[in-house]
């Protein structure tokens, strides 16, 4: 089962995966590390840091012999899949082979924290607004086509592009799990996006962490703390989308709101508690 973080940054998701002995048992670790984990990053410094962090995480559990991590790819994830485009092959010659191997691999799990773009404040932001004709055409044929909103610019935000790209990349079976701006949950312009999620996935899990600081007064206090601290005013949501042809669910929505008036530390504690419950569910009550 191949795993991909298409926007890895400094490798946090992959590092935590490798360090977690429940998610990554010892008998699976070497195979995953060598052959079944991929991550993409467009910034050179972050790419090198991610590689170092991932190698350190692996060797903290398997210290006997140094094994380089070959799943890191220096690339623009969206651009490398554009039809008729050879940008990556020309710009990133040192890892051309890895780009081609990743493109040929069947990807079953995609996880990450996609960048945002709509409303960015600086032209030097990591998430520059770039046109991706093939990807944007897919959005036009799906999310935009199904929308009744007059203004559809938000459907081309980088994180919405990430959902469209990942949905197509896993094909007929797999999991997409992203930590993103939570604005898509109730924004009018996102109606077509929400509709497509129900149509394209068997199961939809959403953990709404709230934190929308673009609100005012009592509503702002109810939204609570910002998960990413002072660096973001947007609400945050954790979303997991499951495609499984054998599932009895079809467009089933499993939604949880973290609650009102919680500061950042309280939210993080609640997230940890939920993770512990998933890993070690309490016994069912006797009848």
What are the roles of these predicted feature ranges?
Residues 1-205:
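SAM-dependent methyltransferase catalytic region
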Residues 122-124, 146-149, 168-287:
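Sequence-level detector for compositionally biased, low-complexity segments
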């Amino acid at each position: 089962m191949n795993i991909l973080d298409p926007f890895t940054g400094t490798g946090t998701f992959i590092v935590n995966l490798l360090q977690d002995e429940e998610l990554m048992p010892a008998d699976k670790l070497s195979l995953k590390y060598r052959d079944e984990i991929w991550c993409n990053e467009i910034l050179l410094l972050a790419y090198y840091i991610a590689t170092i962090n991932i190698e350190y995480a692996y060797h903290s559990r398997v210290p006997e012999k140094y094994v380089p991590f070959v799943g890191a790819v220096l690339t623009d994830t969206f651009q490398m899949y554009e039809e008729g485009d050879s940008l990556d092959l020309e710009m990133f010659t040192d890892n051309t082979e890895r780009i081609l191997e990743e493109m040929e691999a069947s990807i079953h799990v995609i996880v990450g924290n996609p960048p945002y773009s709509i409303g960015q404040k600086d032209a030097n932001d990591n998430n520059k607004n770039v046109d991706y004709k093939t990807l944007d055409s897919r959005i036009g044929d799906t999310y935009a086509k199904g929308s009744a909103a007059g203004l559809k610019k938000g459907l081309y935000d980088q994180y919405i592009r990430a959902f469209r790209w990942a949905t197509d990349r896993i094909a007929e079976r797999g999991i997409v799990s992203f930590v993103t701006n939570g604005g898509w949950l109730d924004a009018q312009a996102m109606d077509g996006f929400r509709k497509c999620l129900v149509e394209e996935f068997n199961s939809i899990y959403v953990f709404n962490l709230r934190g929308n600081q673009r609100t005012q007064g009592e509503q702002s206090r109810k939204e609570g703390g910002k998960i990413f601290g002072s660096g973001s005013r947007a609400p945050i949501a954790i979303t997991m989308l499951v495609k499984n042809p054998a599932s009895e669910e079809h467009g089933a929505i499993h939604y949880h709101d973290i609650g009102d008036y919680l500061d950042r530390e309280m939210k993080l504690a609640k997230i940890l508690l939920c993770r512990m419950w998933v890993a070690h569910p309490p016994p069912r009550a006797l009848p």
